[in-house]
Amino acid sequence: MVQKIGILGAMREEITPILELFGVDFEEIPLGENVFHKGVYRNKEIIVAYSKIGKVHSTLTTTSMILAFGVQKVLFSGVAGSLIKDLKINDLLVAIQLVQHDVDLSAFNHPLGFIPESAIFIETSESLNALAKKVANEQHIALKEGVIVSGDQFVHSKERKEFLVSEFKASAVEMEGASVAFVCQKFGVPCCVLRSISDNADEEANMSFDAFLEKSAQTSAKFLKSMVDKL
């Protein structure tokens, strides 16, 4: 049975290096006003797409990958803003848990990030995370692990950074990972969210993001391909 692997990014810049690194002929399949790139790599069927920015877009694309293409694993590759001093520009981070930091039902005495019949922290795949650590050890890469928070806002202030660390013990912030992990969890599909740091989520984040986006996306893409090689 051919293994089917879904590979996601949020932006075109995040999947361009992925498509180039695999070096196979991809069929382009339009669906839901998006394009899915389908190819065969080392007897594995891989489906690559960028969702566009935000939780709604990434939810749609992840669901499409699972229901329309039948992927059995989902790997997310992209960039994120660092919330802690230990994470520097171009460092790699794998999400052990993810949170929707902009969910606020505190008016009903619910904790931030909580939705009824759900949970605050969304788990990722232990086996895929273990594979990521194995690849990192073999390549002598200092892969970090931690909580990543996701929300429909680009975080660029010291105050918001401090809040996210205090409230969720988060290491990094982005705009898609939690929704990807949530969909995968509900459909029983193993998921790994890998991020390379592009900025420090502070007042200079927009300039840093633009400057380091391409390099950070390359870093994450190369590591992801190494993981696929071992699946």
Segments and roles (model prediction):
Residues V2-T63, F69:
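N-terminal short beta-loop-beta anion/metal-coordinating cradle
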Residues L21, S127-A142, V183, T219-K230:
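Generic non-transmembrane alpha-helical segments
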Residues S64-A68, I84-L87, F182-P190:
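Alpha-helix C-terminal capping segments
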Residues V71-L75:
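Proline-aspartate-enriched helix->loop->beta-strand connector
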Residues L83-F168:
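Mid-sequence, gly/pro-rich, charge-dense loop/helix-turn segments that line enzyme active sites
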Residues F154-N200:
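A C-terminal functional module that forms or caps the active site or interfaces directly
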Residues A201-L231:
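His/Asp/Glu-rich mid-to-C-terminal helical/loop segments that flank catalytic regions of hydrolases
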